[in-house]
Amino acid sequence: MLSTRFLNKVLKGAFFNIQIMVKYKIDFILFLMEREMSKKTAKKKNVMVEENKVDKLLTTVFGDPQKKVLRRLQRKVDEINNLSEKYKKMSDEKLKEAFKKLKKSLSKKDLDDILPDVFALVREASTRVLGMRHFDVQLIGGMVLHEGKVAEMKTGEGKTLVATLPVSLNAMEGRGVHVVTVNDYLAQRDASWMGNLYDFLGLSVGVIINEASFIFDPEYDNEEHEDENMRKLRPATRKEAYAADITYGTN
């Protein structure tokens, strides 16, 4: 008959062997996983290298697409700058009349045709009404937005002012332009702040927020409002605000 001590030794030995086998299998599985991951990483690196080669080849043959876009936009900036003196010499009334004439010219032209004139005119109007003149880089930002692309700008780089360029241009078609901001306060602030410029150009401005809607009215004065700029926002129906040439709202 087998002793208890002998059986314990046998069981311990068997358990020890099982541990070794399990550890060996786990180590082997980990080895296979690492090898597979290394292969995938190598493949990705090879793909990236090949893509870089293709990009370099395309750039060599066709040129850097981003630089091409910037060169094209810079030519427009130069054209706008050349027109600046023309609008600078005009009186306020002449400037307003020039905006109306450009608007009427859309029956024979498209927006891209009149963009340089409109941008130059709006920049001059902004200088007079708001005391702010668009920089060249802001003109580029305005053109990028007009083309339906995304213009990335940091806080303080003048997004609100930049928007006045494509907004004024596209509002000339009379189909309504919507400007979307991130909250109710900014929608009201930007509409009030830029409303003076749009009003100078003969464009109406509406605001639609969660619980109210307004029309920018230079003759209206809500003395109860702490922000002096927002005092010109007259309560209106949502329909009236939507019918404005330019409507500010939130996302």
Residues covered by each model-derived region:
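Conserved lysine of the Walker
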Residues: 159
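Residue-level signature of catalytic and energy-coupling elements of molecular machines
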Residues: 61, 91, 138, 156, ...
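Conserved pre-motif I regulatory segment
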Residues: 72-152
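Conserved SF1/SF2 helicase motif Ia
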Residues: 162-190, 201
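Conserved motor-coupling elements within RecA-like helicase/translocase cores
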Residues: 211-247
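Charged, compositionally biased N-terminal leader segments and the immediate start
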Residues: 34-83
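Conserved RecA-like helicase motor-core motifs
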Residues: 202-212
